[in-house]
Amino acid sequence: MQTNLLKPKTINVEQLGHNRAKVALEPFERGYGHTLGNAIRRVLLSSMVGYAATEVTIAGVLHEYSSIDGVQEDVVNILLNLKGVVFKLHNRDEVTLSLRKDGEGVVTARDIQTPHDVEIVNPDHVIAHLSQGGKLDMQIKVEKGRGYVPGNLRRYADESTKSIGRIVLDASFSPVKRVSYTVESARVEQRTDLDKLVVEIETNGAITAEDAVRASAKILVEQLAVFAQLEGGELAAFDTPAGPRGSATFDPILLRPVDELELTVRSANCLKAENIYYIGDLIQRTENELLKTPNLGRKSLNEIKEVLASRGLTLGMKLENWPPAGLDKR
């Protein structure tokens, strides 16, 4: 009698438009479509890392219940519009940006001055309208975070750094705007009682829909891993399984060659020159170690970090008992 549970053999990703996609997986055993679909949906809505404006200082404004001469919107509406700007920070957790504009016209997210490692996904988003003689001068603090954090929580926590005119915002960090899932019927040979899981997701553009699904699955795997270690005492780290060499089980992605990361030819050749053939080899290197690699500069390093981050990995991770026995080091 067959006792092994079926795992999906078919994965289909359908782009539905800008920042929208539909991911379909089949077949699942009966009931697993709802079990996994609901879990992924909840993680996508609550636990994705994103970026948001958290504090604002506007020249000449002491509090949010003010108006500015020459600006059509009052401060409350300016702040509401600012919350709609989608930021993306590369290799940093926070940044303070400046916006200065005067004269008649529309103020958009494009007017925010950004360094090279900060990206504005929707530069045409309108923040305010200036009339003749109007001026808007503001400092915007953008931070990396997870979920939704009300401003009053951070306002009291940061009381020691409070300054006159500092306006603390409610921050919605989640890059996921909408998620829904459906479970359809699937068939394998004579079995017709199987599930097909279809997840439809829309993001704000700071992360692709496919990467969001991958990240949510990674979170679920890490959280559920502790249930496999119910022996009491300290829990072994998921990424560093203990045991004699050859007995450890690693995340399958770590056993894949670095070629699957689809890095530029320059970056890939630099890694191979340092005997880095597998993703598990790569994540154990630190930034400083990679920067010492001949011909591998900061641009290549940033590329590597972004590709790893899209898969829920970082540099500087520790893996005990690596490499596993029998791994071809070429």
UniProtKB/Swiss-Prot annotation:
SMART domains: RPOLD
Pfam families with a match to the protein in the record: RNA_pol_A_bac (PF01000), RNA_pol_A_CTD (PF03118), RNA_pol_L (PF01193)
Signal peptide boundaries: none
InterPro entries referenced in this protein's UniProt entry, alphabetically: DNA-dir_RNA_pol_insert (IPR011262), DNA-dir_RNA_pol_RpoA/D/Rpb3 (IPR011263), DNA-dir_RpoA (IPR011773), RBP11-like (IPR036603), RNAP_asu_C (IPR011260), RNApol_insert_sf (IPR036643)
Entry annotated with the keyword Transmembrane: no
Catalysed transformations (reactions): RNA(n) + a ribonucleoside 5'-triphosphate = RNA(n+1) + diphosphate
GO annotation (BP), single: DNA-templated transcription
GO molecular function annotation: DNA binding; DNA-directed RNA polymerase activity; protein dimerization activity
Tagged with keyword Transferase: yes
EC number: 2.7.7.6
Annotated keywords: DNA-directed RNA polymerase, Nucleotidyltransferase, Transcription, Transferase
Gene Ontology cellular component terms for the protein in this record: cytoplasm; DNA-directed RNA polymerase complex
Start and end residues of each stretch annotated as Alpha C-terminal domain (alpha-CTD): 250-330
EC category: transferase
Region Alpha N-terminal domain (alpha-NTD), annotated ranges: 1-231
SUPFAM superfamilies listed in its UniProt record: C-terminal domain of RNA polymerase alpha subunit, Insert subdomain of RNA polymerase alpha subunit, RBP11-like subunits of RNA polymerase
Disulfide-bond pairs as recorded: none
Quaternary structure annotation from Swiss-Prot or TrEMBL: Homodimer. The RNAP catalytic core consists of 2 alpha, 1 beta, 1 beta' and 1 omega subunit. When a sigma factor is associated with the core the holoenzyme is formed, which can initiate transcription.
Assigned protein family: Belongs to the RNA polymerase alpha chain family.
Domain writeup: The N-terminal domain is essential for RNAP assembly and basal transcription, whereas the C-terminal domain is involved in interaction with transcriptional regulators and with upstream promoter elements.
Function statement: DNA-dependent RNA polymerase catalyzes the transcription of DNA into RNA using the four ribonucleoside triphosphates as substrates.
Protein name, as recorded: DNA-directed RNA polymerase subunit alpha
Gene: rpoA
